[in-house]
Amino acid sequence: MKLRWFAFLIVLLAGCSSKHDYTNPPWNAKVPVQRAMQWMPISQKAGAAWGVDPQLITAIIAIESGGNPNAVSKSNAIGLMQIKASTSGRDVYRRMGWSGEPTTSELKNPERNISMGAAYLNILETGPLAGIEDPKVLQYALVVSYANGAGALLRTFSSDRKKAISKINDLDADEFLDHVARNHPAPQAPRYIYKLEQALDAM
């Protein structure tokens, strides 16, 4: 894995030196992952309920909040999985058949936050990202969409969802990462994939 990442970075930096270096500054996943692992029993329960890998949930917790259930971002993303009440929170409420959106206190509750984060990952996988065949590519697409929206990702391939999914299915995981690094409008999108791999390796 480390050799593959090193080779990929050499190619990327040589061929696209003007692009943002998404591995700089380096991110040490050890402490955030250790803190996120304390919530693994809840992540396993939520993962089983929504068909989501608990390790993916744990990695997102490490990246998003460093395992802090009271974390609040400048954009008002809240809790362990940094859920925005008015967007992903509202989407989860709709999936559950509820009206409105989650409260701040609800999103600071570890069990509720992780459950909603897992539910949102399921919404992405079974909705806009449905049809992606390669499990690793799907994992990368999930975290990029979780952080920056599925629409922004799909539009880098095509304005038509079916065509976008078809183009994604022509790529392996490294090619998908290269596409995101070169074409996604958000510089943090490829960095999120980099952090995901760092977090998974630290578990």
From Swiss-Prot:
N-palmitoyl cysteine: lipidated positions: 16
Lipidation positions, renumbered (S-diacylglycerol cysteine): 16
InterPro entries in alphabetical order: EmtA (IPR023946), Lysozyme-like_dom_sf (IPR023346), Transglyc_AS (IPR000189), Transglycosylase_SLT_dom_1 (IPR008258)
Signal peptide extent: 1-15
Membrane topology: Lipid-anchor
GO biological process: cell wall macromolecule catabolic process; cell wall organization; peptidoglycan metabolic process
Reactions that this protein is recorded to catalyse: Endolytic cleavage of the (1->4)-beta-glycosidic linkage between N-acetylmuramic acid (MurNAc) and N-acetylglucosamine (GlcNAc) residues in peptidoglycan with concomitant formation of a 1,6-anhydrobond in the MurNAc residue
GO CC terms: cell outer membrane
Transmembrane intervals: none
Cystine bridges: none
Protein localization: Cell outer membrane
HAMAP family according to UniProt: EmtA
Job description of the protein: Murein-degrading enzyme. May play a role in recycling of muropeptides during cell elongation and/or cell division. Preferentially cleaves at a distance of more than two disaccharide units from the ends of the glycan chain.
Protein name stated in the entry: Endo-type membrane-bound lytic murein transglycosylase A
